[in-house]
Amino acid sequence: MKQISDGVFYCGLHDKTRKVFDQLVPLPQGTTYNSYLVKGSQKCALIDTMYVKFADKYMAMLSAENVKIDYIVSNHAEPDHSGLIPTLLEKFPEAKVYCSPKCAENLKNMLGVADEKMHVVADGEELSLGDKTLKFIHTPWVHWPDTMFTQILEDNILFTCDFFGAHYTANELWADCSPELALSAKRYYAEIMMPFAKFCAKYLAKVKEISPKFILPSHGPIYDESGVAFIENLYAEWTSENVAKKVILGYVSMYDNTTLMVNYLENALVSRGIEVVKTDIMETDEGELAMELIDSAGIVFGTSMVLTGPHPKSIYVAYLANILRPKLKFSAIIGSFGWGGNLTAPIDAMFTLTKPKKLENVIAKGRPKPEDFQKLDALADAILAEF
């Protein structure tokens, strides 16, 4: 346990061995699960708890502190933050869980927390711990509908749960504001927060209005005065409507026919002053692709035909590009087939939430021929016209 300020302590844990989050998101550095203890002059509160995998270590840490927990604040019901609430309620049977209405519903359904053990807070409600006052601020959809922030009014410390988080396991508790941290925060935003970018922008404005001294998220390092500006500026950039003069060219090729088309289009776009992020989607992890989607204007899928449709990996990438809801303005499909099937419809069908403009696809039969390369030049011109 580490002291953050007078009466405020960090009781989180590192999980450097975890390689994947939600069985989807790669974790190059593992992650942290941040929990906080607030000691008032009369009462004590935990702000979020711990992933159940670390139950023994977490409970031993609290026992060593010899503290009685009066309140458990659940900013968000996802099990990596709420998992030990039942265990804590057994150890501290008089404690109450303070949470949003939707969080109470989730805690009941997912963890079996009884209604009488929870107090549902109104937006703006306050709770006195004596010389410290907690204020609860409803912030749904960053990134679950149950999310809220908690503020210590006297210290102006803001607990933002997953908002401003990072899967970053540096040894230092305080953010170093390094390029490495910025990259981890960007990966986290892209994979988890980008589908809710409009809500992120809304609550970023709320945070700036509060102007907290410290920001304490539920993953990654915590932010002091300089760190607050660092993470706020990054989120302001990512949540803006701005896109770069950049195109993602994600491809998979079985016998290099599609590769020939991809390389030709890449050169055609670069010669027109367009940045191209070319990536073999059989090798690129989802996090890297998600980060590029934050500010890319368009995406071009390069795919081979597998039986009667596009390569399954292309469909998967299209699915991700849809559910992450990036600011894509346009998309196109290029590729090669042998004798029949439909290379484009299954990819186009993935875009139900994100609605990029569909540019003219270029599909070659077998090895691309001169007329196919001419069509790729026309596609490059069409892409340039979108800027």
Task: List PLM regions with ranges.
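FMN-binding flavodoxin-like domain, especially the glycine-rich phosphate-binding loop
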Residues: 170-173, 180-215, 219-222, 264-277, ...
